[in-house]
């Protein structure tokens, strides 16, 4: 489990960037796989999610995650509860209610956790390149503001994701980023493979968030290279493995 000091210093807010350790799953899902969308046993996933929720002093049904679709859709949680196999389709969650854990699942995409400790408003988002480019982080901030958060008070951390030296992309990939802002060239460097590039997803997210007046940091962990600690879709794909586990990052307000 990883914690960011900026979030840990907030009174009344708990957060966790979980590694793949500490669960009951085996094989390629070893061991804290929290994704019902994987081929893992649902009973194992349920137990893993129960363990995650228990670290917050809550039950498995208090842990809310989404059917993530690489969108900019953000849901506001009031008294809502749902079981994960029937979760709503979106990529961000916000709430001002204690007693609920907001989770974002990832296996190379970036989990992003948000908090305004003074207003007691929190958020969690899943940001792959499509969601990052579309503005899922900014959409999450906007949804938090509707609950009373102030962007100048927000603490935001981009969690473990595919790293700045690991995310190789094709020749066509940079075009929409450069069309959005020519300075986004800063997040691409040439790959050893001709015509390809290496993309800095976390760096791109941190700058985008900063440009809407919110300070953000990144944990700096690379899910592709840290095999023992994180699930990685790309690593499994390169190894010829068709499925993968899902890691969880989560945040909650204390009662």
Predicted regions and their residues:
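Active-site microenvironment for binding and transforming phosphate-containing groups
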Residues: 1-255
């Amino acid at each position: 489990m990883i914690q960011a000091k900026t979030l840990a210093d907030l009174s009344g807010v708990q957060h966790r960037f979980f590694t793949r350790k500490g669960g009951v799953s085996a094989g390629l899902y070893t061991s804290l796989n929290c994704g019902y969308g994987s081929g893992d046993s649902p009973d194992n996933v349920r137990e893993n999610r129960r363990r995650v929720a228990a670290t917050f002093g809550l039950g498995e049904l208090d842990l809310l995650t989404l059917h993530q679709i690489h969108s900019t859709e953000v849901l506001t949680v009031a008294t809502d509860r749902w079981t994960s196999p029937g979760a709503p389709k979106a990529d961000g969650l916000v709430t001002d209610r204690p007693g609920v854990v907001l989770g974002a699942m990832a296996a190379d995409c970036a989990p992003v956790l948000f908090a305004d400790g003074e207003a007691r408003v929190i958020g969690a988002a899943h940001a792959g390149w499509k969601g990052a480019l579309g503005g899922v982080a900014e959409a999450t901030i906007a949804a938090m503001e509707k609950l009373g958060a102030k962007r100048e008070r927000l603490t935001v951390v981009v969690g473990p994701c595919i790293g700045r030296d690991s995310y190789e992309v094709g020749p066509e990939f940079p075009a929409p980023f450069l069309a959005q802002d020519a300075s986004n060239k800063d997040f691409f460097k040439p790959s050893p493979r001709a015509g390809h590039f290496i993309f800095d997803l976390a760096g791109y997210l941190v700058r985008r968030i900063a440009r809407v007046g919110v300070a953000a940091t990144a944990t700096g962990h690379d899910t592709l290279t840290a095999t023992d600690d994180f699930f990685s879709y790309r690593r499994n794909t390169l190894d010829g493995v068709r499925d993968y586990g899902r890691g969880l990052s989560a945040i909650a307000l204390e009662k």
